[in-house]
Each structure stands twice: as structure tokens, then as C-alpha cells.
């Protein structure tokens, strides 16, 4: 949101006691400690936010283009309130009504529009059902917080069993959500984080919350693979007084691993980078398991490569974490080293090969036969 947009949104939300959801990977667009904050919508977002918005009769969409990643179903819930009145506010007129049908479109600055609406509210606006609404928000958030804490396993689609096999293959390894819980236990509330594209970073969408703006760097719909490391370096250059942590899967990290050769130079500030190590391109593999009968092509990564080893070779500190306790301890020490000793740490978090939901289930479908192609021509791949 533009300058002043978060504060203007807070004032309006409090006047109505209306729950506030944010878009995919925009977890810093509203204070996470606010009682009306319901979390991010979209892929692996907040079930609380999804359940609350599904009950809405009016939705005010401030400064958002309502992109598919922020509105697609999650956890089996098709939550977008198709019968509600939708008011969309955006500076770009081309985005109004682009992805969702809107009742009212407003071309304008989110902060100015929110302030104007607040100033025009009638006395008693929002009073009807106010107490019940506040209780519903609190209860829904509490229920989701308990459920999220207990979530460990990723679910398979009917007719597939990749995640069952992944757990059986590495029963002692962390699941992705176990790693995210371990990270949350040591991540400073004031930290700036960056997220690369990919399955394991996206699984973590529901976990981080922020009490200040400009704390979450994410690639958004551009989808640039390798974004996580260089963006967190830039964040540290801009805010050397703030702890920073970058996140990337091992596939995406391989795109920017060469930056490790530069980070160790004396005039570069120290950072912390976590790499989720499961030796696969996860998002692509999930599509393969669901729509191509486990016919993986180019999704496997070399298990002989050690990113922690590469970091050490570049004069940095490389650490391997195999358990939740090890990961929490490694991150806590890395933050201390970053802020007090000027040491850059790369943490390889060793996780099993479980896969989250496909990114765009709504945009994919089963393949169809193509004329002239015989399935007998297909060769079995050894994995």
C-alpha cells in the first residue's frame, strides 16, 4: 500500500470492526498483531481469512488487483464470495474488474480512498452485529492458529500417493511445515525476509506476520527464479540495522548461488540465507504427480551438491540443519552472527520431498492424446 495506506486501512477497519485479509505474499500489508487481522488469502494462506471473507456481504479491496494467487481456493475451500458486493480500489484503471467481477470500481490511491470513506461513515455505521462480528473474528483466528500449529503432512490428491511415499522414504527428515515452525521460533519480529518462488517457500505463506510495513520481499506474479538471495542482500544494504533472512528452495537457489562469491567481500553487509534442501524442483514435480502420472522430467537435483559447502568455500559460514531444534538454534546463532559479528550464514534445512498443492490447479488439466504420438514410444525413467 502507498504511504499512509496501512494506517488509513486500520482506522477504517476499526470503525467498522471489519476483519482484514491481505493478498498472497503481502503479509506485511496490515499489522499482524492487530485483532482484526485475518491473514493472507490465496495459496497456502490463512484458513481464517478464507472462512471470514466467504461470509462477507460487502468486500472493500484496497490497492489490489485481486490476482489469481490471492483469490484461488485453498484447503478445499472455494471462499471467494460471489454473491457479495465487491468494491475494488486501484491506481491502475486497467486492473479494475480484470480478474473478478466488481460492483463498484474506484481508480485512486488506497490511503486517500480509505480516509475518504472513513470520513463519510454515518454515525453508528458497523454497529449492527458488531459484538458478534468481533467474537467471530477472534474465534475463527484462534481455531486456525491451533490447526496451523498441528499441521505437518502435505496432502495427496485422490489417486496419487507421492507424499505418502516421500514420508516413507525419509521418515527421520523434517517435513516442510516442521521447518517453518522451527524458523518461526527464532525469527525476530523486526526482521525483513525475502521469499523465492517454489513449493517450499509458498508452503510457508501462512506463517510469517509483521507489525510493520516493508518487511516481506516476494517475487509476486513476475515469478523470477533466484529472486530470494539478491533481494535480501539489497534489503540489508538498504537497512543495515535490521536483521534479514532470505528463503529459497534448492532449485531456485541454484539460479543465484554464484552471488555467494560476492557476499563475502568486506564492503558487503552480512545476511542470513535459508535453503530448503529436498533435491527437487517441487512445484514442477507436483504438476507431474497430479497430471502426468509421476512421469518426472528434469525435476531431480544432484544429492552430491552441498550449498553449505559452497558457502564455506566462499569464505562464509555454511551450516546443515536436520532437525527442528537444530534449525531453530542455527537460525538464532546466524542472526546473532549477522548483527553482532558481521558473519553471513547459509543454513541448509534438510527436508523430505513432500509437496504442497499445485500453484494453479484452476489453470491445469489432464493432458489429452496428440495425433501421431504413441504411448508405447515412452521410455520408463529411472528415479
Task: Please place each PLM-identified region on the residue numbering.
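Short glycine-rich anion-binding loops that position phosphate/pyrophosphate groups of nucleotides
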Residues: 1, 25-27, 64-67, 198-200, ...
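Glycine-rich phosphate/diphosphate-binding loop of Rossmann-like nucleotide-binding domains
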Residues: 1-14
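Thiamine diphosphate
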Residues: 6, 36, 43, 50-55, ...
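Active-site diphosphate/adenylate-binding microenvironment
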Residues: 9, 143-241
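A short, gly/pro- and small-residue-rich
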Residues: 11-17, 71-91, 213-214, 360-374
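Short internal beta-strands
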Residues: 19-24, 87-90, 273-276
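General beta-strand structural signal in soluble alpha/beta enzymes
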Residues: 21-23, 61-62, 88, 108, ...
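Glycine-rich, acidic loop regions that bind phosphate or pyrophosphate groups
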Residues: 26-145, 331-335, 348
